[in-house]
Amino acid sequence: MAIVKCKPTSPGRRHVVKVVNADLHKGKPYAPLLEKNSKNGGRNNNGRITVRHIGGGHKHHYRVIDFKRTKDGIPATVERLEYDPNRSANIALVLYKDGERRYILAPKGVVAGDVIQSGVDAPIKAGNTLPMRNIPVGSTVHNVELKPGKGGQLARSAGAYAQIVARDGAYVTIRLRSGEMRKVLSEGRATIGEVGNSEHMLRELGKAGASRWRGVRPTVRGVVMNPVDHPHGGGEGRTSGGRHPVSPWGMPTKGFKTRKNKRTDKYIVRRRNK
């Protein structure tokens, strides 16, 4: 994997920094694992914007990823690594001994030809998936299940990982990249190692159009809007907003705590780092 800084042959190329991975498959994705991925421009069924800054972007299919990894006892060979437009991580196409193919998140260090497997008897090796009660304390994992059988939900983006720091009865304690430490059920599964493509954070799109290709629209500051559109809007000439920063709906921002789910507070051992 290489970091390539483009030559300034035009204003749009001047600031571009690319992450080039020669190991990625250059052909088409595996068709049976593709699904339609329709665009909605951030609108709901009433046509109203429910998520801002979404619209346009290149068409692409959704790759069906196996986050559950429940095909136990059957070894699988990594056929190839692929780019996935739906996530920051790369994905791996694996071929099981019984002939079935699935996509999984590509772990760091796993290359084409490697053999992976799932189940309680799987060895502690990058890419293998086990219940967390069978993973040694201190191990680095990713694709961590919050609810056993639901599929991995934590540590799935490029370069992400969690560390198992303790085991206590039916729960294990994991430390996330944010610094948060929380308990999860030890019956839940996790994959050994960290997610690959950690250099993703080093890329620079270089121009606004590159964000538009990805379906991301511009973010407009509230102070340049009209009062009808934002609490910071209006005023004669340039203003500072005239109040503490708030969202377009009047909710205080920049440090104001918005977490409402008190039901799961008991599972959080330590809050994330600020």
Curated annotation (Swiss-Prot):
One of its GO terms (molecular function) is transferase activity. Gene3D superfamilies: 2.30.30.30, Nucleic acid-binding proteins (2.40.50.140), Ribosomal protein L2, domain 3 (4.10.950.10). GO terms for biological process: cytoplasmic translation. Residues 256-265 have a biased composition (Basic residues). The keyword Transmembrane helix does not apply. SUPFAM superfamilies: Nucleic acid-binding proteins, Translation proteins SH3-like domain. Keywords: Ribonucleoprotein, Ribosomal protein, RNA-binding, rRNA-binding. It holds the Pfam family Ribosomal_L2_C. Residues 223-265 are annotated as: Disordered. GO terms for cellular component: large ribosomal subunit. The keyword RNA-binding applies. It comes from the Bacteria. One of the primary rRNA binding proteins. Required for association of the 30S and 50S subunits to form the 70S ribosome, for tRNA binding and peptide bond formation. It has been suggested to have peptidyltransferase activity; this is somewhat controversial. Makes several contacts with the 16S rRNA in the 70S ribosome. NCBIfam families: rplB_bact. Belongs to the universal ribosomal protein uL2 family. Part of the 50S ribosomal subunit. Forms a bridge to the 30S subunit in the 70S ribosome. HAMAP family: Ribosomal_uL2_B. This is Large ribosomal subunit protein uL2. It comes from Vibrio parahaemolyticus serotype O3:K6 (strain RIMD 2210633). The lineage of its organism: Bacteria, Pseudomonadati, Pseudomonadota, Gammaproteobacteria, Vibrionales.
